[in-house]
Amino acid sequence: MFHRFRIGQAAATIVSDGPLVLPVAAKVFQGPDAAALNGALSATGQRTDAVDVQQNCLLIDTGGKRVLFDNGMGSSKLYGPDSGQLPASLAQAGVDPASIDALVLTHAHSDHCWGTMGDDGTPNFPNATIYIAQSELEFWESNPPGQRRERSVAGVKKHLSPLHDRITFIRDGEAFLPGIQAIDTPGHTPGHMVFLFDGDWCLTGDVAFHDPLSYAFPEAESVFDVDPRQGVETRRRLLDRLVTDRLRVIGYHHPWPGLGRVERAGRTYRFVPGDE
């Protein structure tokens, strides 16, 4: 599955790695009561016995470079049987993985980087330079304690550590590829990055990962955040910027294809889908 659009003058495509199924909202979002969370889901036609999200990977051709942002779950079915669709989506869009020059990672959680290596130990994107924050890679390679973190540590050792010679570290504020700037947004993970594009677009990664819950309850802490309090601070700061600067949004986990704008809704926010 793919969706073509434009980011400024650049050709862009959203390519799907398929849906994920997360636990019930009250187990993912801490703070609001279950009734409030479920009410927001029901109001947008979503079920309440689980949290459904997409994996919308951005592919953009800019400055003579073909760039892919994040790459899904690979062959893992950790969050449901229907992930792992990225290779088929790229093929449907007519994109050879070998033609991808750069692989940019918002962060190193399973659903963003486990498509980097094949099960046979060879890179799925054999000609791509990998861009990631140094603090992100170093955190996961330091073996941080915690049961939930063990999977991410193992994933980084499989998918990123063998490719150190292909990795380029990116810094806050750096325009590291033509028309693309990295912005440090820690909390979800220590080295989480979002990306600004010429043409007033922002790829937001997992700072506000769910529509509508991340917008209706920006103060809710996420069980997936390494530093939940910092995650809330970063989310509020980014959402304010998205509204103030009128930036269009590429939401990795938002309903397909994840494109739209953010508006204020009283003291909270709402996501408004659309390419324009």
Task: State each model region's role.
Residues G80, D198-D200, T204-E276:
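Cap/insert and terminal regions of metallo-dependent hydrolase folds
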Residues G84-V95, S99-D111, P126-D184, Q230-R246:
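Metallo-beta-lactamase
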Residues F2-Q92, V194-V207:
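Conserved beta-strand hairpin/beta-sheet module of binuclear metal-dependent hydrolase folds
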Residues V67-F69, V104, I130, W201-L203, ...:
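Residue-level marker for buried hydrophobic side chains located in beta-strands
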Residues H112, Q181-V194:
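Active-site glycine- and acidic-residue-rich loops that bind
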Residues Y79-G80, W114-N124, R261-V262:
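Metal-dependent catalytic neighborhoods of phosphoester/phosphodiester hydrolases
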Residues D17-P19, N71-G74, A108, S135-E136, ...:
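Active-site metal-binding loops of divalent metal-dependent hydrolases
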